[in-house]
Amino acid sequence: MAAYDWIESALATVHKANWYRSVKTMSSPGPTAVLNGQTVINFASNDYLGLAGDSRLAEAAIAAINTYGTGSTGSRLLSGHRMIHEQLERAIATWKQTETAIVYSSGYLANIGTITALVNKRDLILADAYNHASLKNGARLSGATIHEFGHANVTELQTLLETHRSHHRRCLLVTDSVFSMDGDLCPLPELIALAEQYDCMLLIDEAHGTGVLGKTGAGCVEHFGCRDAELIQMGTLSKALGSLGGYVAGSASLIDYLRNRSSSWIYTTGLSPADTAAALAAVEIIREGSELRSQLWQRVTQLKQALTTHLAPEDEHQTMQLLPSESPILCVQMPTPAAVLTASQQLLDQGIFAPAIRPPTVPTSRIRISIMATHQAVQIDQLIVALSEVAQGS
C-alpha cells in the first residue's frame, strides 16, 4: 500500500547518515561471551557487578518460580501483587533510606509513569539536555512546558527558574545521576539547593548509579551525602542489580500517590516473581559487602589511567578523546559516525566488543565502554592495547 511507502525512504535516509542499527545475538551476560558466533570480551554490558550470571540470583529466581509461578498474572492492584514485591520494596527503601518504594516492570515505565503522574499542562519541567530518552519522553507525554538546560549547567538552570518558575503551578527538575552515554555525574548538591530555593520537585534517575556509587552502593544520592534531601529517587533493577524492573523511592505520600495515579504501574502486569526475587537477592548482596564494588573500581581506575596516557589531549594529531567520567562508563569520542563505526569494527576484529554510539542518540560519535567487576586485569590490558592500535591508525 502507498500509505507505507515512506518507510523504505526513511530507512534509506538512516543508512545514508550511518545511523542504521541492528540487533546482535549475545550468548551470555559475562565478561566473555559469544557475539554472532565470535568469542569476544564484552565491554557493552550494564551488568556492572556481574550479578546477572551470579548463582545466588539464579537460585532466588528458581525458588520464586517454584513458589509463585512464572508470571504475576495481573496488575498489582488486581491479581498481580505478591508478598515478594513488598519484600523488595521494603529492601529498596531501607537501602535508599526513604520511607518506602514502589517497583515497576521496567525503568522506562517508572520514569514515564512517575513524570506523567506528577505534572501536567499547568506545570513546568526543567531537564538536563543529556537526560535519558525515557525521561525526555515522560516529559513530553506529561503535557507540561519543557525547557532543557545545558548539560550540568546550573547557572543556565537558575536563569530558567528565574524566568519561568513563577508562571507555573508546579515545577519538576529532572536529571540522570550518571549520564549513560557520557559517564559523568550530575551536580546533585547544586540541583538540590535550587530545588529548595525555587520550590521545585527534583527527580533523579539512578539507573547507572544504583549498586555502583556510594558507601553501600545506594547511588549518587549516597555518594554526595544528600540522603536528607527530599527527592524522587528512581532507579533500575536491570543494570548493576542484574535483573529486570524499575523503582521509585521516596516519601510515603509520594509512593501512595503513584500507586493511585501512575498509569504505567496501574495498568501493567506486575514484575515477574523470578525477576523480583533476583533483584531482592542482588540488593541484599550489594548491601552486605563492598567486594564487588571494590573490584569494579580497580578495573575502572586501571583503564582510565591507561587511556588518559594513550589518548593525550595535547597531541594535535589525536582524533580520539576520552570524555570525563566518574563512573564505570568510559567514552572515547571520535570525529564522525563513519569513524566510530570503523573503530568499533577494528576492535571487534581483535575480539573486543565495544559498541559505536552515534547521533541522534548522542550529540557526538563515540565508543562506549562499560566495565564490570568480573572483568580480569588482563582483559582490560587487551582493551588498552586494541584502543591504542586504533588510535594510531585513526
Swiss-Prot record:
One GO BP: biotin biosynthetic process
Pathway in which the depicted protein is active: Cofactor biosynthesis; biotin biosynthesis
Reactions it catalyzes: 6-carboxyhexanoyl-[ACP] + L-alanine + H(+) = (8S)-8-amino-7-oxononanoate + holo-[ACP] + CO2
Keyword presence, Transcription regulation: no
GO molecular function (one): pyridoxal phosphate binding
Pfam families linked to this entry: Aminotran_1_2
Keywords (A to Z) from UniProt: Biotin biosynthesis, Pyridoxal phosphate, Transferase
Cofactor(s) of this protein: pyridoxal 5'-phosphate
Binding residues annotated for substrate, in chain numbering: R21, H132, T361
CDD domains: KBL_like
E.C. number: 2.3.1.47
InterPro entries membership: Aminotrans_II_pyridoxalP_BS, Aminotransferase_I/II_large, AON_synthase_class-II, AONS_Archaea/Proteobacteria, PyrdxlP-dep_Trfase, PyrdxlP-dep_Trfase_major, PyrdxlP-dep_Trfase_small
Organism superkingdom: Bacteria
Residues at which pyridoxal 5'-phosphate binds: G107, Y108, S180, D205, E206, A207, H208, T236, L237, S238, K239
Signal peptide (residue range): none
Family, similarity comment: Belongs to the class-II pyridoxal-phosphate-dependent aminotransferase family. BioF subfamily.
Oligomeric and partner information: Homodimer.
PANTHER family named in the record: 8-AMINO-7-OXONONANOATE SYNTHASE, CLASS II AMINOTRANSFERASE/8-AMINO-7-OXONONANOATE SYNTHASE
Known role: Catalyzes the decarboxylative condensation of pimeloyl-[acyl-carrier protein] and L-alanine to produce 8-amino-7-oxononanoate (AON), [acyl-carrier protein], and carbon dioxide.
Name listed for the protein in its UniProt record: Putative 8-amino-7-oxononanoate synthase
The encoding gene: bioF
